[in-house]
Amino acid sequence: MDSQVRQNYHRDCEAAVNRMINMELFASYSYTSMAFYFSRDDVALPGFAHFFKENSDEEREHADKLLTFQNSRGGRIFLQDIKKPERDEWGNGVDVMQCALQLEKNVNQALLDLHKIASGKVDPHMCDFLETHYLNEQVESIKKLGDFITNLSRMDAVKNKMAEYLFDKHTMGGKN
């Protein structure tokens, strides 16, 4: 049944929003995996765990905003299976930050692609929504992760577990 509130909302935009919802939920799922990996008794880096748990919550909020947007525009929500993260063991701080950086870049590219679809279908509401709630935040997340990788690498944290511990404690706010 078609929505009575639907106006200037192309089916391609609707489908792309559904795909974006899935991507945000995948990102949330991946960050949850990272968070609880760092909470393990044999890893025990609470700052990393907290950081990734917050990222998971944020990605879930992004999905919720898209779900609300879809309903407000008269679109229909079609949830898809959420893919399992590519790994269960996340390794060291540098490795996981590089994975997180790639994840954020993938999400950013998907948002840019969604914006391009919305622009092509002349949907100023969707363009404004994406610009207001997503695009700048993605760039900030990418920059933050890049900075973390630079500082962890500078400390040679891959070979120096004390450096990783200190980064967790002082930069990530970990408390043991």
UniProtKB/Swiss-Prot annotation:
**Cited PROSITE patterns:** FERRITIN_2 (PS00204), FERRITIN_LIKE (PS50905)
Please list the residues that bind Fe cation 2: E59, E104, Q138
Q: What is its EC number?
A: 1.16.3.1
**Entry keywords, A to Z:** Iron, Iron storage, Metal-binding, Oxidoreductase
* Gene Ontology annotations of biological process type: intracellular iron ion homeostasis; iron ion transport
| Gene Ontology MF terms in the entry | ferric iron binding; ferrous iron binding; ferroxidase activity
- List, alphabetically, the GO terms of the cellular component aspect: cytoplasm
Q: Which branch of life, at top level? A: Eukaryota
Xref: Pfam families: Ferritin
Task: Locate the residues binding Fe cation 1.
Answer: E24, E59, H62
Among Gene3D superfamilies, the record links this protein to:
1.20.1260.10
The regions listed as transmembrane in this protein's record are none
Q: Where is the Ferritin-like diiron domain?
A: 7-156
Q: Does the keyword Oxidoreductase apply?
A: yes
What the record says about temperature is: Thermostable.
Q: In which tissues is it expressed?
A: Spleen (at protein level).
Give the reactions, separated by semicolons, that this protein catalyses. Answer: 4 Fe(2+) + O2 + 4 H(+) = 4 Fe(3+) + 2 H2O
Give the pH dependence: Stable at acidic pHs.
Subunit structure of this entry?
In spleen, forms a homomer. The functional molecule forms a roughly spherical shell with a diameter of 12 nm and contains a central cavity into which the insoluble mineral iron core is deposited.
Q: What does this protein do?
A: Stores iron in a soluble, non-toxic, readily available form. Important for iron homeostasis. Has ferroxidase activity. Iron is taken up in the ferrous form and deposited as ferric hydroxides after oxidation.
UniProt similarity note: Belongs to the ferritin family.
Q: What is this protein called?
A: Ferritin, spleen middle subunit
Protein species of origin: Trematomus bernacchii (Emerald rockcod)
